[in-house]
Amino acid sequence: MQGIVSLVLTASVCWLGGASDQQADYRTLMANGEFAKAREVIESRLLHDGTVSGPLRVEMQFEIERMERIRKDFTKKRQDVVDFVKKYVPNVVPQDLDRWEKERSLECMMIDGEKRYFNNAARNLFRIDKECLRIWNERHADEQAKPPAEGALDLDAHIRTIREETLRQKQAYSEPVQMRIRYTITVKPDVTPPGEPIRCWIPFPREIPHRQTDIRLIRTDPADHRLAPDKDLQRMIYFEKSAVKGRPTVFSAEYEYTNYGVHVDIEPDLVKAVDPQSALKPYLEQEYPHIVFTDTLRELSKRLVGTETNPYRVAQILFAWVDENVPWASAREYSTIPNLPMYAYENRHGDCGIQTMLFITLCRMNGIPARWQSGWEFQPPDDSMHDWGMIYFEPYGWVPMDVTYGLRKTDEEKLKWFYLSGMDSYRLIFNDAISQPFTPKKDHFRSETVDSQRGEVEWKGGNLYFDQWDWDMHWDVLKK
């Protein structure tokens, strides 16, 4: 079921009610927010329509799951939003909310006749709307002015050192950081019948020459495990453990690895177009359902790029546009979004993966090979799941990029563009592609259908979604 056929629903933030015919196509019903009716239609067809088989049957089964996931992501009512916003905008009126919704700064949708807001919609408003962001920054100015915690990473100083050292040593990699990770998944009590085996996949780092090395598995719980081969583009370590009545089921993996900072000093005039029929061809093509060259994105690309033909300068144009026009905001689960780049374009916000997917798509449309990379980021004392990517410039080869970190605030041109051909040392890389099969394969739908950073859990009765288990990432910097 990992190769589920994705369904392109409307990318509109607020889905408006419409069709009411019980026999209307379930796609139309879903697009109109009539989830209960859509479910009735799907279940009826699955039960009575003998032509529903193979991929179509899997697709329809997943749409039932997708609607349930959307419900979990959209639990807030308008009053919940008002209560939060009033802390910062005391005189807020209904017309303000209407305007923010129309501008897609306040994420909502109609579900079975009731307007529901994304769980983080209110907080995101103060990331997306420029005036609200200004108010937020003024209110939190004292916090932002506080000196960094002792031992905190100075990111810009760190990447400056990487650039200086790679230039001095005349190589792309420098400033290695050795880390120890202990990752734990705790399945909540009684989510399966007692005695039933629970299957668990925990993300595990890939060995990447010169970039991520010296990976050493220290211990696991349970001791029996299956480690996926390094060639897996979404690498996992797999466990099984039987559920015990009234008790959580715990899985963990502890390991060490070393990650290197990267910087490739690009001379734009040396960069040339790649052969589209070479081994790079897969990284120039569409990958449904997300990397799709829609007419809307083609028009955007044409407008942005104009007559520029140099691949590096085209990438700069696209990188700067995403950095400036698609601010970071907390995102709903990717499995609820039919097309991530179109979501970014139409809503003008997105988290790191949504920003990255848009940039990758625009690059490929312009003949620039680009691909996904993801895992976790660390800015001691902080950490987070994070998505970034790789981009190919001839004759330099593959180099890392991070459009979320964007243009650095500096007058030094080379340092400003660091994250278009470089990466800091504080990364943990699990994935080099999207939506890849696991070893061993998962029998039921994945909780995360695109990325793989938290893990996956299931039993013979079905997938265990994120609200049925918890994850914990504990880490230590051993050497830098």
Descriptions of predicted regions:
Residues 9-21:
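Bacterial Sec-dependent signal peptides at the C-terminal "C-region" and cleavage site
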Residues 33, 229-237, 243-346:
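Acidic low-complexity segments
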